[in-house]
């Protein structure tokens, strides 16, 4: 089963399960506000929510952005997009199916977006395509545009690994089985975090991809040291 197919299967119960995490929506708001604060509260903004899932991150971005901001939600999973489409959205928000690492940058508009937010995407991108996926968002951003990435990472942090393993094995996977019957998806989510880049390694990917002003912070609460928010800027054009 592909990753997209696994998310298709779990789409109908996904919001219920992630909503049981008390910090989930708060951290999405933090990421969305971090992006909008950096691109500026101004008319005519064009933003992308890459790996928008069921639209929770899109909603956070839409609420943080000025009225009239264009927000494009992209996701590989048809099932997730179907769930997102059931909600009520302003005319300036739309959704489209697309796969990170295989984006049609020319069709999406290279250099035409002021900001891109992506939550829980990069660990789902095959390692051999990760740098390409970073390059795609770089190409989509306008000069001076900002990228905000929210992602789990425990590599190189033994305390974070112990906490994550315990939460995944004794809470996430059992709840996933109980509420959704989808053991494979939640076991995959556990392992995808374990196998993902360290914080330093991912930050280095962003720098290698041409980004500057790369910084990161970790979440509060039980996710401290596990969930991280990265910010990075595409250089402005030299005058």
Give the role of each language-model region.
Residues 1-41, 56, 60:
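Conserved class I S-adenosyl-L-methionine
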Residues 46-104:
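Class I SAM-dependent methyltransferase SAM/SAH-binding core
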Residues 101-116:
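A short acidic, Gly/Pro-enriched loop at the edge of an enzyme's catalytic core
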Residues 114-129:
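A short SAM/SAH-binding and catalytic strip from SAM-dependent methyltransferases
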Residues 131-143:
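A short glycine-rich, Lys/Arg-flanked "PGG" loop and its adjoining helix->strand segment in the class I
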Residues 144-151:
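Conserved beta-strand signature within the Rossmann-like core of class I S-adenosyl-L-methionine
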Residues 152-205:
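C-terminal alpha-helical "lid/dimerization" subdomain adjacent to the S-adenosyl-L-methionine
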Residues 209-212, 218-239:
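Core SAM-dependent methyltransferase catalytic element
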């Amino acid at each position: 089963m592909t990753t997209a197919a696994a998310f298709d299967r779990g789409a109908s119960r996904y919001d219920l399960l992630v909503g049981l995490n008390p910090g989930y929506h708060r951290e999405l708001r933090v990421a969305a506000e971090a992006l909008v604060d950096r691109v500026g509260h101004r008319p005519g903004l064009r933003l992308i929510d890459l790996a928008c899932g069921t639209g929770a991150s899109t909603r956070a971005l839409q609420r943080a952005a000025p009225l009239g901001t264009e927000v494009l939600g992209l996701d590989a999973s048809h099932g997730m997009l179907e769930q997102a489409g059931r909600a009520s959205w302003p005319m300036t928000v739309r959704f489209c199916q697309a796969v990170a690492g295989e984006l049609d940058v020319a069709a999406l508009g290279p250099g035409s977006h002021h900001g891109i937010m992506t939550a829980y995407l990069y660990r789902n991108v095959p390692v051999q395509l990760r740098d390409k996926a970073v390059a795609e968002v770089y190409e989509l951003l306008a000069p001076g545009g900002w990228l905000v990435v929210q992602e789990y990472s425990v590599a190189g942090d033994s305390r974070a690994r112990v906490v994550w393993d315990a939460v995944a094995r004794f809470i996430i996977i059992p709840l996933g089985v109980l509420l959704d019957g989808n053991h494979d998806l939640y076991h995959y989510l556990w392992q995808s975090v374990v196998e993902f880049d360290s914080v330093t390694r991912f930050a280095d990917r962003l720098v290698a991809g041409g980004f500057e002003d790369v910084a990161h912070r970790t979440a509060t609460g039980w996710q401290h040291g596990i969930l991280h928010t990265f910010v990075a800027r595409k250089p402005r054009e030299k005058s």
